[in-house]
Amino acid sequence: MIWHVVRLDCSEVAEEERRDLEASIAALARLEDVAWLRVARDVEDPNVTGLLTVFTDADALTRYRVHPEHVPVVERIRALGIPTVRLDVATDDEVADLP
């Protein structure tokens, strides 16, 4: 499976805008290729929002990246000028083992 992890530095984003963005990101959980998704704030740095997403394989991640519901969220993050760091890693875990 593929873990897609994104770190968003929201230090320059107003709280209301940030909450709305986090809700938009969380709504991506309903997309067919998303096996598991969580959005949460960093426990040590309150300015950071993290996205943890799991896909069954690299093809599912590729489809997600161009999905018409995902693209506007990415564009919004860019328009807000939010610095991001992305990490995509493959593991031999099974999606069925996730909570």
Language-model region placement:
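Short S/T/G/P-rich N-terminal loop/turn motif that feeds into the first structured element of a domain
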Residues: 1-49, 56-66, 82-99
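Short, flexible helix/strand-to-coil boundary loops that buttress conserved ligand/catalytic motifs
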Residues: 65, 74-77
